[in-house]
Structure formats: structure tokens, C-alpha cells
Amino acid sequence: MQLQRRFRMAALLLGLGCALLTLCGLAAYAQGRFYSRGRYDYSDAQSQEKAEFYWSRLRYTSSGGQSNFGFGFGYGGWAGWSRDYPKADRQFLMALKRLTRIQMRPVEQIVDLDSDEIFNYPWVYAVQVANWTFTDAQAKRLREYLLKGGFLMVDDFHGTADWDRFMVGMRQVLPDRPVEDLGDNDEIFHVLYDLGERFQVPGEQYVNTGRTYEKDGYVPKWRAIRDEKGRIIVAICHNMHLGDAWEWADMPEYPENFASMAYRIGLNYIVYGMTH
């Protein structure tokens, strides 16, 4: 009988603890930015700082119906667009500041396709793009953004099924523009760093599994969509996870060569986008 009472008391305390954690999580979410590994704040002054370059991350509605933080298709229960956010963004911005002369805002910017605000930002990054969905109005706005000089970099989707779902959305946006494999001599790989020789950049899972690939994405694909003048308007990083490499560059167990390659690719893409 005494053992049963102890068991019931332990179960009650466990339930109260879970409820308390849930309430704390909701409070943190209401007070500031919250993501899968904690809270990340920045000052109002930083978020309003004027610059020539803004790191912009695309917030989209996923196939699970999620656009804000919340449970749905994504990583760790978070909406897919927010994977690695915001640590990957912040760490990449530190590298951009140190290694280029681009005058940039030190914090990230979230952009949506439901307003014309996206036209204020020259370069946009999107992840988990196998899960994105667009309304006709959103697809039209993204198409106009790209054809008027914008640049989109997509990352962190893997294998055949992810590619097919990504292309459903991409064909809404640019139905008449072909996708091409980029050659090693393409200008985008040489505007800042010479990246004629590249390799697959895995996510954090490499530390525990030793695998550089996810799903059936065994071979990295460097692809692009160009406008009628030949300018790359969509840079496609398929079968790799550059954002994870940026995020975990300070993790001793994550190999430096992967992080270094990921940063160089991102920096090249930004310099290309800002000069074309």
C-alpha cells in the first residue's frame, strides 16, 4: 500500500512538472523568439538598423499548414521554415562581417510572401523547401521578386521525394524556367572563394552516424534557375545541409572542413547575388 502511494505521488509530481514546463515554454514564446534549442533575443536598435544587406529568411506555410512556430512538419516539432533558426543565421552573419566588406545588419530578418516587404531585401534564404506551399498570390509575388533582381537560396532538403515536392512549389513560381546543374567553372563558385572542388556538407547527424547523406540523397546537387539574361535567381543546394554546418561550426565534434565549405558557399552566393 505504501509503495502504491509513493508511485501515485511520483506520477502526480511528474505530471505537475510537465505542466510547468509547458507553461514556461508558452511564456518564453510570448516574451521573445523561441526555437528548438532555446530563446534568442536581439535589441530593437539592431533590428531597425539600416544596411545595404539584410540576411532574410523566408517564412512560408508548409504542407502541414504551419507558418509560425508550432507543431507541424519541421524539425523538433517546429515549423519547417525555422529549422536552425536563429543560431545558424547569426553565426553566418558574423562570418559575413569578418570576411567581406558588405555593410550588413547584424541580425536576421523574417520575410513573408503576403506583403510587398520582400522587395526591400535583395537576398532570401529558405530551408526545408520540400514542405513549402504557396497560394497563387504568394507564388506571383515571389516570381516578381526574383525577376526584378531578387535572389533565393534554398537548402536542407534531401532525396528524390523531397526534390519532387520542392519542384511542385517551384513550378508555381517559375513555370517556364528550367533547372540546370551548375558546372565547377560557373562564376558563382569563384566570385569570392574558388570552389571548383566541393563536397557534400552534412547536418549535425554526421556526428553520431558518420553519414554525410539523408534519405536517398547520396550525391550533392548544385543546381540553379536563371532568368532570361542568364543571371542565377534561385541557387539550389540539394542533398546537403549548410544551415546545420553554420549552426554547429562552434561544436568541437562537428568537422571543421564541413563548416568551412558551408560558409564559403554561402558567402559566394551572397556576393554573387549582391553583384548581379
Residue spans of the language-model regions?
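Bacterial N-terminal signal peptides
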Residues: 11-25
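Surface-exposed patches in mature extracellular/periplasmic domains of secreted proteins
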Residues: 102-112, 154-159, 177-185
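A generic secondary-structure signal for well-formed alpha-helical elements
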Residues: 100, 150, 170-177, 273
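N-terminal secretory signal peptides that target proteins for export/translocation
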Residues: 1-9
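An acidic, glycine-rich "communication" segment
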Residues: 36-39, 63-70, 162-243, 247-248, ...
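Aromatic-Pro/Gly-enriched surface loop or interdomain linker
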Residues: 28-123, 129-130, 241-244, 248-276
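Short alpha-beta junction capping motif
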Residues: 55, 118-163
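Extracytoplasmic/secreted envelope proteins and their assembly/folding machinery
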Residues: 89-93, 139, 143, 163-167, ...
